[in-house]
């Protein structure tokens, strides 16, 4: 127990002097929690303990979103087996966006897809998501402050504005292009369900092509309303009809 309390060093896959792997140790920790009558939750970034009640509420909020967008359909495990596709495990990532005085717990349901399992099936371009250069942001700021200056591409009567948009749960937006199955989270299992798994309808955090899928999704959306996406860098976009320019960094516009 002292060894488990100390924990492994970050580069080790097992505890020093122990034949137990991390999966086995995780099962033991879960067992100890159940024996004590408590289920403890921890911040996946800081490692600090989080109030279980707040974590459960955050997870239920996330599950509400998952159900609303139809992230997956419940199907019999035999469907996945017939397709020859193994359902992938999922996990919760819990983070306190606030502090100990004012908690703001967020939970995200993520898949656990490993590189070793997909290196033969996913090509490099399917894993790539472009990022804008810092110079692009400086250019946008320069255009903003030269509003109405001759040669800047604007007229005196134009009022340029800059806005920043953060897209929540961006990786859930695109439709899933691959046939994928996941193990159902405990929060979505009901008595009498039987041996069900989830067949994904949309992309999901934790899958290796999720970022690329999101990029293709927003690019198609903007192209549909008159924007041109950059050729040298597809993280940039422009619409000449109203002189709108922008850059995308991940899920931030």
Model-inferred region functions:
Residues 235-239, 243-244:
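Gly/Ser-centered flexible loop/linker motifs
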Residues 243-253:
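Histidine-centered acyl-transfer/condensation active-site motif
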């Amino acid at each position: 127990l002292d060894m488990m309390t100390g924990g492994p060093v970050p580069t080790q896959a097992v505890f020093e002097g122990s034949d137990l792997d991390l999966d086995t140790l995780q099962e033991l920790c879960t067992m100890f929690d159940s024996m004590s009558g408590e289920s403890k939750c921890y911040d996946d970034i800081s490692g600090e303990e989080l109030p279980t009640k707040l974590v459960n509420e955050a997870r239920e909020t996330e599950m509400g979103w998952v159900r609303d967008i139809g992230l997956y359909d419940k199907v019999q495990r035999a469907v996945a087996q017939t397709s020859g596709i193994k359902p992938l495990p999922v996990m919760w990532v819990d983070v306190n966006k606030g502090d100990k005085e004012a908690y703001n717990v967020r939970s995200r349901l993520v898949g656990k897809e490993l590189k070793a399992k997909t290196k033969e099936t996913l090509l490099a371009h399917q894993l790539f998501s472009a990022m804008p250069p810092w110079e692009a942001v400086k250019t946008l700021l320069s255009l903003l402050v030269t509003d109405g200056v001759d040669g800047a591409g604007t007229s005196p009567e134009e009022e340029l504005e800059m806005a920043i948009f953060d897209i929540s749960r961006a990786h859930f937006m695109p439709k899933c292009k691959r046939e994928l199955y996941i193990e159902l989270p405990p929060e979505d299992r009901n008595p009498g369900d039987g041996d069900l798994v989830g067949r994904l309808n949309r992309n999901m955090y934790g899958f290796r092509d999720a970022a690329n899928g999101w990029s293709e999704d927003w690019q198609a959306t903007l192209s549909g309303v008159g924007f041109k996406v950059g050729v040298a860098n597809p993280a940039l976009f422009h619409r000449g009809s109203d002189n709108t320019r922008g850059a995308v960094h991940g899920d931030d516009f």
